[in-house]
């Protein structure tokens, strides 16, 4: 292990010990907010310390076994060789685990999300595919035990959606779905195609973290135009007889958001404001990223909505993620929410890219 990486890990272990002492301080115990904050940091560092202690123990075992290789007894040397091989294997595994601990965590990973699916090129077929994508994400959310709610929807003329926006809440939602932003392409024979020709259409997906009051961009009410309208029923579970649906226009940016999920106008307004803040924050993030031209793009993609990230080929039963070169002949399973193999591959690629940067920065 490189000395620079070892030093970073040692500092993390020292911080863990320091926090342990602070958590025993009566002044800290008497401050619930401070105690909770330190407890969370202590819990995050605990796996690092455990793996580092195990690494130290295995390093001692390796040194001991290497010393025994010079023993005059052939039987002892044979045992030492066996022990050395096993210890070196465990040491290598622990080194990998420790390096993964150094990968910076995304502060948004534990947040809920706004999922936006929009039909692109392809007309009616694109709208139908938008409906298929929404169903895929809903099924995946069910498997994860997450909660989903559709905030607004514009249905396609022949089914599906021209645009649909949902809120997904639960554990690690953003962490699992954050790489889904981008252009999704579908290749299949439409039901109305009499010649059996394959059509290509596309949808864009945007994954926006739902922000808390501290992280969200402050929205000046003077910059908003709020309109009310009667829910069409497409986005919610009912058809309103009152104008409870909300449309908010952010005048400086021109962004427009809607919510027609709730019967209460106030609840719809609160959800629409939260969605607007998420979009404004994402807009600012994208602007900053484009300005940092020297910043390396992740192998798994920049999250640009125009970037084609995945192709779903129905005649071949194939789904291909172009960012990591992964092809699965499990299209039906994926469309039913079996996305873990895709999502795991994207997460692993992201970690590998981050580890490569850590190694490079460590000289």
From Swiss-Prot:
PTM characteristics: Methylated by PrmC. Methylation increases the termination efficiency of RF1.
Primary subcellular site in the record, as a coarse category: cytoplasm
Record's GO cellular component terms: cytoplasm
Taxonomy, superkingdom: Bacteria
Region annotated Disordered, chain positions: 284-306
Gene Ontology terms, MF aspect: translation release factor activity, codon specific
Compositionally biased residues, Basic and acidic residues: 284-297
Location in or out of the cell: Cytoplasm
PTM-bearing positions, type N5-methylglutamine: 237
Signal peptide: none
Keywords: Cytoplasm, Methylation, Protein biosynthesis
Membrane-spanning ranges: none
Protein task: Peptide chain release factor 1 directs the termination of translation in response to the peptide chain termination codons UAG and UAA.
Family, similarity comment: Belongs to the prokaryotic/mitochondrial release factor family.
PANTHER family for the chain: LD18447P (PTHR43804:SF7)
Protein name: Peptide chain release factor 1
